[in-house]
Regions:
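ABC ATPase "signature
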Residues: 173-174
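A short, surface-exposed alpha-helical micro-motif characterized by mixed small hydrophobic
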Residues: 155-157
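Conserved ABC nucleotide-binding domain
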Residues: 17-18, 77-98
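Helical segment within the ABC ATPase nucleotide-binding domain
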Residues: 129-141
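ABC ATPase NBD Q-loop/coupling interface
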Residues: 7-27, 62-65, 178
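Catalytic Walker B motif of ABC-type/P-loop ATPase nucleotide-binding domains
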Residues: 115-119
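Conserved ABC ATPase "signature" region
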Residues: 61-86, 113, 134-137
Length: 181
C-alpha cells in the first residue's frame, strides 16, 4: 500500500514510495504478509533454494549449480527456523505456524537488511506463537525486524519498542506498558 503523502526513507536516503516491489526487494527489504505463500508441492529445502538470490533467468536456472556457500546458507536458515529435520517434507504438509516459519526462512535466504512481517502469529496455536516470538528475537540479533501485529500478548513477549499507529499517525511510542497506558 502506498501512502497518500510523505516519504518513507530506507538507510536514510532512499524514498521507498517512489520504487516498485522489485527494486524494494533489491535494496534488501524482505516482506512477509499475513497469509503464508509457500510452494506447497515442493519440499522445504526446495522452497528455500527457490528463494536464494541467484540468476532466475531461463539460462541461469537451467545451468545453476548450487555452491557450497549456498548449501551452508540453506543449512543455517533451516536451523534458524527450526525445520532442519523436516527439510525433505513437502511444504503443504506443514502446520500453519511451520509454513509461516518457512516463509520467514525464504526471506532469510535472500539475506535482507530489513524484514517487514505482517501479523506473523495470526491463526497460530499458543505454542507456535511463543516459538515465533523466540524465532523473531533470534533473527533480530542480526537483522532489523519490523512487525505489524494486533496480538498484544505476542508483542509483549517480543519485549521491543512499540509504535502505535492510527490511520498513518503515530499515537504513542515506547514499551508495551507505556503505549498501553
Amino acid at each position: 500500500t502506498k501512502p497518500d503523502e510523505g516519504t518513507v526513507l530506507f538507510d536514510g536516503m532512499t524514498d521507498l514510495t517512489r520504487l516498485d516491489e522489485t527494486r524494494i526487494a533489491e535494496l534488501g527489504i524482505g516482506r512477509k504478509f499475513q497469509k503464508p505463500t509457500v510452494f506447497e508441492s515442493q519440499t522445504i529445502e526446495d522452497n528455500l533454494l527457490l528463494a536464494l538470490n541467484v540468476d532466475h533467468s531461463v539460462k541461469g536456472t537451467l545451468f545453476w549449480r548450487g555452491s557450497r556457500d549456498e548449501a551452508e546458507r540453506i543449512d543455517r536458515v533451516l536451523e534458524t527456523i527450526r525445520l532442519t529435520d523436516a527439510r525433505y517434507r513437502l511444504a503443504g504438509s506443514l502446520s500453519h505456524g511451520q509454513k509461516q516459519w518457512l516463509e520467514i526462512g525464504m526471506l532469510l535466504a535472500q539475506d535482507p537488511k530489513l524484514l517487514l512481517v505482517d501479523e506473523p502469529v495470526a491463526g497460530m496455536t499458543d505454542v507456535e506463537t511463543h516459538q515465533t516470538a523466540e524465532l523473531l528475537k533470534e533473527i533480530n540479533k542480526e537483522k532489523t525486524v519490523m512487525v505489524v501485529e494486533h496480538d498484544m500478548t505476542f508483542v509483549r513477549e517480543l519485549g521491543v519498542k512499540v509504535t502505535c499507529l492510527h490511520e498513518g499517525t503515530v499515537l504513542a511510542e515506547g514499551t508495551i506498558d507505556q503505549v498501553s497506558s
